[in-house]
A protein has these predicted regions:
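Canonical P-loop GTPase G-domain recognition
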Residues: 148-200
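Conserved C-terminal guanine-recognition region of P-loop GTPase G domains, centered on the G4
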Residues: 88-168
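Switch II (G3) loop of P-loop NTPases
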Residues: 42-44, 66-89, 120-121
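Conserved beta-strand elements of beta-rich interaction domains across eukaryotes
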Residues: 24-27, 63, 67, 74-75, ...
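Glycine-rich phosphate-binding P-loop
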Residues: 17-44
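Conserved P-loop small GTPase signature centered on TRAFAC-class small GTPases
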Residues: 1-4, 181, 195-211
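Short, flexible boundary segments at extreme N-termini or domain junctions of P-loop NTPases and their
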Residues: 1-24, 56, 91, 205-207
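Switch I (effector-binding) loop of TRAFAC-class P-loop GTPase G-domains
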Residues: 38-66, 89
């Protein structure tokens, strides 16, 4: 008997999405992975030999899709650039999301945009190639901090640099509240945005996508 994911139909191959979560310290990558997959991670990210300086790979099923979620290492900066060791490990995310991620999710906590985040799009192009921003969506975490405001209203009062980052990522953004992981509509909407705006997957060569 073939297992069928919730919300899917027997005989239909389940669509797969491969996502890479990127961001600085404290942006909420692990919690966002929990929310996306609808499951809690197994213990502390420091447990079982894991390290915040290494990529973490998780797989599961969510909202009728098979998900591969790669959590890139915490970003540490040396002057104006990412540390060499962290950059090398970040590059490994492409391998873990083989044949290539469908989207890079750039996590930015609500109300915590800094000069570091302003530099990230350029850094991503240096790490993954010029085509990466076409496959990047800004994911605002700590959505509860909006206190009922819409994302558009929030952006109007923020540093113009945040809008610039979003524009460089094709204008794509989404808000997630990891304090309410049971609200699955926020996950469905995010996965739909990824499906509509970033397919095919990215393998480091913008002229050679895969499925």
């Amino acid at each position: 008997m073939t297992d069928v994911l919730p919300g899917s139909h027997a005989g239909t191959p389940e669509p797969e999405l491969r996502l890479v979560l990127l961001g600085t310290i404290g942006c909420g990558k692990t919690l966002s992975g929990d929310t996306l997959l609808g499951q809690a991670s197994s213990g502390s990210p420091f447990a079982s030999g894991s390290s915040p300086r290494l990529c973490q790979l998780r797989r599961g099923a969510s909202e009728g899709r098979r998900l591969t979620v790669v959590e890139a290492p915490r970003w540490y900066w040396n002057g104006g650039h990412m540390e060499a060791g962290v950059r090398k490990e970040t590059e490994r995310a492409l391998e873990l999301a083989s044949p290539g991620p469908h989207a890079f999710l750039l996590l930015v906590p609500v109300g915590q945009f800094t000069e570091v985040e302003r530099r990230v799009p350029t850094e991503l192009e240096e790490v993954f190639g010029e085509g990466v921003l076409k496959h990047t969506l800004v994911l605002f975490t700590c959505g509860d901090y909006l206190m009922g405001r819409g994302a558009g209203q929030y952006l109007e009062g923020e540093d113009p640099g945040l809008r610039e980052v979003i524009d460089r990522c094709g204008g794509q953004y989404h808000v997630i509240n990891n304090r309410r992981p049971q609200e699955r509509e926020q996950v469905r909407e995010l996965l739909e945005k990824v499906t509509m705006t970033t397919i095919p997957s990215y393998n480091g060569n913008d002229n050679n996508g895969s499925n």
